Amino acid sequence: MPIGVPKVPFQIPGEEDASWVDVYNRLYRERLLFLGQEVDSDISNQLIGLMVYLSIEDDTKEIYLFINSPGGWVIPGVAIYDTMQFVRPEVHTICMGLAASMGSFLLVGGEITKRLAFPHARVMIHQPASYFFGAQTGEFILEAEELLKLRETLTRVYVQRTGKPLWVISEDMERDVFMSAKDAQAYGIVDLVAVE
């Protein structure tokens, strides 16, 4: 039996009665954002809009981005990352469950010293992939060139934000590299592991 998105009571300051809002809208009001799906243009635009709005509303209060994502599209993910770097409030990133592929890229993009993983979380990095199978040869070559540029961008960010040498990141991105929360901390993707 699907229950949909749960609703919770919320009382607007100055109002007599509470109104029922979905749990995510209630949490957004507390500056708690969630990426609990594959990264695509829709979720990217929603998160970007929320971060910009929250930054305008109060640029001194921190934002928390909870991540449980198998990854997703590179360009929408990079747009979220760029917004995290652009907004004035510090963005904490918290991995719960899985931060794979673009999810791990967003995790490492949090404010350095404020990136956290839950104790049983998993993190995975790898290189960007393309699904451009039915293309003409010329289009395929252009796609491959674009993929190499994107890989270079992602690699540069991982190097900058983890402190790992370029050759280590490049080598590790050749395949799927899964890490425990402690491994991700040692790698520099997160700064802290929550205690059990």
From Swiss-Prot:
What this protein is called in its record is ATP-dependent Clp protease proteolytic subunit
Lineage, highest ranks first: Eukaryota, Viridiplantae, Streptophyta, Embryophyta, Tracheophyta
Q: Which residues form the active site?
A: S101 (nucleophile), H126
> Per the record, what is one GO cellular component?
endopeptidase Clp complex
Under PROSITE patterns, the record lists: CLP_PROTEASE_HIS, CLP_PROTEASE_SER
The molecular function terms in GO held by this entry are: ATP-dependent peptidase activity; ATPase binding; serine-type endopeptidase activity
Function in brief:
Cleaves peptides in various proteins in a process that requires ATP hydrolysis. Has a chymotrypsin-like activity. Plays a major role in the degradation of misfolded proteins.
Disulfide-linked positions: none
Q: What family is it from? A: Belongs to the peptidase S14 family.
Q: What class of enzyme is it?
A: hydrolase
The reactions it catalyses are:
Hydrolysis of proteins to small peptides in the presence of ATP and magnesium. alpha-casein is the usual test substrate. In the absence of ATP, only oligopeptides shorter than five residues are hydrolyzed (such as succinyl-Leu-Tyr-|-NHMec, and Leu-Tyr-Leu-|-Tyr-Trp, in which cleavage of the -Tyr-|-Leu- and -Tyr-|-Trp bonds also occurs)
GO process annotations (BP):
protein quality control for misfolded or incompletely synthesized proteins
Q: Which PANTHER family match?
A: ATP-DEPENDENT CLP PROTEASE PROTEOLYTIC SUBUNIT (PTHR10381), CHLOROPLASTIC ATP-DEPENDENT CLP PROTEASE PROTEOLYTIC SUBUNIT 1 (PTHR10381:SF15)
- Where found in the cell? Plastid
Q: What is this enzyme's EC?
A: 3.4.21.92
- Cite the entry's keywords alphabetically: Hydrolase, Plastid, Protease, Serine protease
Cite the SUPFAM superfamilies for this sequence.
ClpP/crotonase
Tell me if Heme is a UniProt keyword of this record: no
Gene3D superfamilies, alphabetized: 2-enoyl-CoA Hydratase, Chain A, domain 1 (3.90.226.10)
